[in-house]
Design a protein with these regions (language model features):
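Pepsin/retropepsin-fold aspartyl endopeptidases
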Residues: 1-130
Length: 130
């Protein structure tokens, strides 16, 4: 699948006057979205906890995780999503968790985000209870 970017506004959920806009790489292989820590700190987003992650090259890394408001321009919607405080030179990545929160998938032919229907539960959720 070809790589592409989407414009995203990141906003401090506790102070909506503090935000920035950036082009993010859409990365379905990344569980979480990544933003360079100085950008998140610059708008006052605070870490909530630490997460151990496996990076694309196989290394393990401990990173801070917080929450921010994400507005994906082409969707015109705003939702709270988890975000990893990346290194200063980190790429801006829009990960699978954010994509699922917004109810979208990637259309590789058009390099656009497309709406999907959410699945609630599975086999056990569909069984009658006696």
């Amino acid at each position: 699948m070809g790589m592409f970017k989407v414009a995203v506004e990141i906003t401090n959920p506790n102070d909506r006057a503090r935000s920035f806009r950036e082009d993010f790489w859409v990365d379905t292989g990344a569980l979480y979205s990544f933003v360079p820590a100085p950008r998140l700190e610059g708008i006052g987003v605070e870490p909530l906890r630490s997460r151990e992650l496996i990076l694309a090259d196989g290394r393990r890394d401990q990173r801070l995780l917080g929450e921010a408001l994400f507005t994906i321009d082409e969707l015109g919607e705003t939702l709270t999503c988890p975000v990893i405080f990346g290194p200063s030179d980190s790429l801006y990545l829009l990960g699978a968790t954010a994509l699922e929160n917004f109810g979208v998938d990637v259309d590789p032919a058009t390099k656009k985000l497309k709406p999907i229907l959410g699945v609630i539960g599975g086999f056990l959720a569909s069984r009658e209870q006696f």
